[in-house]
Amino acid sequence: MTQNVDRETVVSRLLAADDILILCHKNPDGDTIGSGTALCLALQQLGKNAAVLCSDPIPAMYDYMPITVFDGSFRPAFVVAVDVAGIQLFGERNNIQEYAEHVNLCIDHHGSNSGYAYETLVDAGAAAAAELLTTLIPEMGAKITPEIASCLYTGCLLYTSPSPRDVEES
């Protein structure tokens, strides 16, 4: 059974771990990939060993993101999922199920989150998981670099599906 945790606990857990695997959902969209990559970059900035794993190939439209794809070069001591409301959303490929059944922490914005992780931070009022990370990353002591900002912007922009007029006006 999952335990709902606050932001301070999330920051504490992430700072206490060294070898961190970040899981994204199958058929990855801008929020799961943008959030996962932003968190990975922030953790690496803090000296952590971190990488991202997704069951499905990452679409070419996200090639501009500096994604560190998990290659098995370290043994994850802590597993965090971003933007994944239920265990069935992980998919089957890339041995992801090996890690999906042992998620330490889930950071999500879906009120329908099934509570599969040991600890969960869900803010159903957030537009995207990326929105949560815009404040969690500085709370961890990491700087929001242009690369991290781009990933977070992608997560917020593509998940909320703005109209062409919204993009033009901004």
Regions found by a protein language model. Give the residues of each.
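Positively charged, low-complexity intrinsically disordered leader regions
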Residues: 1-17
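Predominant activation on well-ordered alpha-helical scaffold segments within soluble catalytic domains
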Residues: 11, 37-40, 59, 130-135, ...
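Anionic-ligand anchoring segments at beta-strand to alpha-helix junctions in alpha/beta enzyme folds, i.e.
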Residues: 21-74
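Fold-independent oxyanion-binding glycine-rich loops
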Residues: 25-26, 55-56, 82-85, 107-110, ...
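Divalent metal-coordination and catalytic microenvironments
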Residues: 29, 39, 80, 133, ...
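Active-site cofactor/cluster-binding pocket
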Residues: 63-119
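Short alpha-helices
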Residues: 110-161
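Single conserved hydrophobic/aromatic residue that forms the stacking wall/gate
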Residues: 162-170
